[in-house]
Amino acid sequence: MIKIDIPAPNVTITERQQSANDNEPKIKPIHGFIDFHQIPRDKGGIFMFYNIHDELLFVGKARKLRQRIKKHFEDTVSPIKHHRDEVYKIEVCVVDDPMEREIYETYIINTQHSKYNIDKVFFK
């Protein structure tokens, strides 16, 4: 069996409310998330959505991480469109090489049995 080391997340954000006494400007939440600014805008990589029980819901890859992740919460064709409210935590790993992104995505989907991925699934 091939052993692939999954990279450690570069960024992890969770649902949170903005405190009234925060010195940061008021941020409009997107499905409970207000920290999208922490996700790199022009970097490629993989991302994982988890629920509050740390169950892997979805794995994806992107050339531009922030844009793609936000799109999952906005568009009507996302595989998680009916499950957006389940997402509690987002982990992001910056991976520059497109081939490596593809390998990591497929590997994570199949070894960690993501709940809502429908493509690249070999474990069902």
UniProtKB/Swiss-Prot annotation:
Domain of life (superkingdom): Bacteria
PROSITE patterns per record: GIY_YIG
Cited Gene3D superfamilies: GIY-YIG endonuclease (3.40.1440.10)
Domain GIY-YIG: 42-118
Pfam families: GIY-YIG
Listed GO biological process terms: nucleotide-excision repair
CDD domains linked to this entry: GIY-YIG_UvrC_Cho (cd10434)
Name under which the protein is recorded: Uncharacterized protein YurQ
Record organism: Bacillus subtilis (strain 168)
